[in-house]
Amino acid sequence: MEQLNICIDIDGTITDAYYWIDLCNSYFKTSITEKDATQYYIHKILNVPLEEYNEFYEKYKYKLHSEQKLRKDVKSVITKLSQNNNIFFVTARERDLTILTYSYLRKKEIPYDSLFILGTHHKVPTARQLNCDLFIEDNYDNALELSKAGFKVLLIDTYYNRKPLNQNIIRFYNWDEVYGIVDRLFEKSEAI
């Protein structure tokens, strides 16, 4: 049986997409909700200058990323997928979050083969390098870029990515749906 190479984003994909709201509301004295998060870029949602948001992020990024909650069923789904497939985490996180990211995945007991911390949202070169069969993502622009490069993408539904999809992108709503989607896409139950 041929193994699939499955690339998975971290923030907003395996973790709660709105993990930042409470801390941002407290810091910026705002009262935004998940439903207000209709854009990917947080400073735009908060209506604050990028520089001001970046100051906040630099101060709190370790707290934000270490305390994120996993989405429901993530651990069990990835564990099952990892039994017959290669799991690669590919994140746009900055490289200074490398140790924290390894520690987070270990603490949450998420199995994987390799972790790639890119420091950029442009994931196509890494997906090519890994011969990616499927990419699981939350960022609409990343999903579009990957899909236009020929990769199949599963896009987890969020308020900020509800835009038109092309034929290489499949929207899903819960991690427990992933088994069936992978099976249909690759027409082999051995993939899961």
From Swiss-Prot:
Domain of life, source organism: Bacteria
Gene3D superfamilies: HAD superfamily/HAD-like
Keywords: Hydrolase, Magnesium, Metal-binding
Annotated EC: 3.1.3.-, 3.1.3.23
Keyword Cell cycle in record: no
Cofactor entry: Mg(2+)
GO molecular function, one term: sugar-phosphatase activity
Catalytic activity, as annotated: sugar phosphate + H2O = sugar + phosphate
Family: Belongs to the 5'(3')-deoxyribonucleotidase family.
Stated role: Catalyzes the dephosphorylation of nucleotide monophosphates and of different sugar phosphates in vitro.
Name assigned to this protein: Nucleotidase CA_C3379
Species this chain originates from: Clostridium acetobutylicum (strain ATCC 824 / DSM 792 / JCM 1419 / IAM 19013 / LMG 5710 / NBRC 13948 / NRRL B-527 / VKM B-1787 / 2291 / W)
